[in-house]
Design a protein with these regions (language model features):
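Conserved catalytic core of sirtuin-type NAD+-dependent deacylases
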Residues: 1-238
């Protein structure tokens, strides 16, 4: 692994056009559970499967049950950025990293200092009234009970992409643009199992495709460099 990290460091040192594409594995080292690993959310037992609870239909029909799960399992407001988040913010300040494209909804990249963050699945930090669109901070959701309501009486919804909902087209198009122009594309902490997000790597045209993930992914065979290790552990050595 040392040789691979040395190679990655060499590439990074010589680049000013890095794009990072990350998933849940980036935040697990900050104590936020991922979805598909052995001890992830999908392998825990609930009254309903998480993918049912986190769906548009369930949100509308069982809003109180949705919020019970959401407050307990999706909000981690005390989580702190780890080595991966901090390194990416450092690269951005140095003019190396052009953008972070993330499937995560925890806001940790921004907390670490990254400015150009494209959140494919939204953010728990943003919430809005479904009737009048008034914005609400996440603290209002976290400290409340039951169904959060706006002063106008409307239901407040987190600005996250639920199952059955489409991704924001502006965010997708901007991500495609960054990926297609990148010198180095680093993919980290994702199983590349969720589409359309996982399909974004198809737009990369360079020859330095790097994959950093604890377990193998479907894209390993396409990558120019593959490191099977926790991403924070790898990035702390760069």
């Amino acid at each position: 692994m040392d040789e691979k990290i040395a190679k990655l460091k060499e590439w990074i040192d010589g680049s000013d056009n890095i794009v990072f594409f990350g998933g849940a594995g980036v935040s697990t080292e900050s104590g936020i559970p991922d979805f598909r690993s052995v001890d992830g959310l999908y392998n825990q037992q609930y009254k309903y499967p998480p993918e049912t609870i986190l769906s548009h239909t369930f949100f509308l029909s069982e809003t109180e049950e949705f919020y019970r799960f959401y407050r307990a399992k999706m909000l981690a407001l005390d989580a702190k950025p780890n080595a991966a988040h901090l390194k990416l913010a450092e690269w951005e300040r140095e003019g190396k990293c052009r953008a972070v494209v993330t499937q995560n909804i925890d806001g940790l990249h921004q907390k670490a200092g990254s400015k150009e963050v494209l959140e494919l699945h939204g953010s728990v930090l943003r919430n809005y009234c479904m009737r009048c669109r008034k914005p609400y901070p996440v603290e209002d959701i976290a400290k409340g009970t039951g169904i959060p309501r706006c002063s106008c009486g409307g239901i407040i919804k987190p600005d996250v992409v639920l199952y059955e909902e489409g991704l924001d087209s502006y965010t997708i198009n901007k991500s495609v643009d960054y990926n297609s122009k990148a010198d180095i594309l680093i993919i980290g902490g994702t199983s590349l199992a969720v589409y359309p997000a996982a399909g974004l790597i198809d737009y990369y045209r360079g020859n330095k495709l790097v994959l950093v993930n604890k377990s193998p992914t479907p894209a390993d065979r396409r990558a120019d460099l593959v490191i099977h290790a926790p991403i924070g552990e790898v990035f702390s050595q760069l």
